[in-house]
């Protein structure tokens, strides 16, 4: 997948051989692209349960995941994690720790850098974006679904083992 060099959003492939560059919906035709962008996600905990979302679109459509997404150009990963949760599930989140940084390869062979945070929310009834999330549910650690996207189960297992470490007060240092 290719991403706009201005905003980091995924762009269509275009037809470069015919002189038609990939196009960003917001910034138009792009000849200069970035190959990948870092990702940030949040293991959201409330009363011992974790909020998971079922993907409404590819890749992994219909699979459960830890909510998150791409870090936009110039955005701090902490800010991206909070923004992605609000966009996908319509809830605010307070980040409380870092579960880990994962270096993975996507199904397309692209390098991924995924920062997984731990967070809490007081919201118990998310209002998800139906374009992103088809279903949501709170799961106890012994009830995590088996049909999870990519390596999301590994991230949840790391969180459950207590690997999250605290963040500085401003979440940046």
Enumerate the language-model features and the residues they cover.
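Charged phosphate-binding loop/patch that engages nucleotide di/tri-phosphates or the phosphate backbone
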Residues: 158-173
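NUDIX/MutT-family hydrolases
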Residues: 128-160
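Active-site-adjacent beta-strand/loop module that shapes the phosphate/pyrophosphate-binding cleft
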Residues: 102-125
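Short, well-ordered beta-strand micro-motif
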Residues: 44, 116-120, 137-140
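A short coil-to-beta-strand element that immediately follows conserved catalytic motifs
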Residues: 14-15, 92-100
